[in-house]
Swiss-Prot record:
This is Large ribosomal subunit protein uL16c. It holds the Pfam family Ribosomal_L16. HAMAP family: Ribosomal_uL16 (MF_01342). It is found in: Plastid, Chloroplast. It comes from Angiopteris evecta (Mule's foot fern). Keywords: Chloroplast, Plastid, Ribonucleoprotein, Ribosomal protein. GO terms for cellular component: chloroplast; mitochondrial large ribosomal subunit. Part of the 50S ribosomal subunit. It comes from the Eukaryota. Coiled coil: none annotated.
């Protein structure tokens, strides 16, 4: 499971997820990608489940890139504990995902295989996603320039 080796601080504020993703929203490594359409926290377990689903479907062919990393600790208090006495201990790690963020990229497989693999991974995600290709990305960039 993914988690940082060390962090500067053990606990973080929850924060807010406003707006769209300004970074990590373009295909950089592969030919096909899975893009988030809603804001959410994606846990390390969900990222790993998606990775396993894609690699199992694509078999030996293809290379997979995970474009998100769980770097935010989520704390929880023990069950049936009274209020007060500080913040709970870190339980798991999440990645803050905003709309437009690329979650996974894949190349070295056909579009049909990539689409099917990403669809299986999309079922593991807690949000709506879309399958995109480098060709589709270039078209959307050209539309913005006009």
């Amino acid at each position: 499971m993914l988690n940082p080796r060390r962090t500067r601080f053990r606990k973080q504020h929850r924060g807010r997820m406003r707006g769209i993703s300004t970074r990590g929203n373009r295909i950089c490594f592969g030919k096909f990608a899975l893009q988030a359409l809603e804001p959410t926290w994606i846990t390390a377990r969900q990222i790993e489940a998606g990775r396993r689903a894609i690699t199992r479907y694509a078999r030996r062919g293809g290379k997979l890139w995970i474009r998100i990393f769980p770097d935010k600790p989520i704390t929880m208090r023990p069950a049936e504990t009274r209020m007060g006495s500080g913040k709970g201990s870190p339980e798991y790690w999440v990645s803050v995902v905003k709309p437009g963020r690329i979650l996974y990229e894949i190349s070295g497989v056909s579009e049909n295989v990539a689409r099917a693999a990403m669809k299986i991974a999309a079922y593991k995600m807690p949000i709506r996603t879309q399958f995109i290709t480098t060709i589709k990305m270039k078209e959307s960039i050209l539309d913005r320039k006009e």
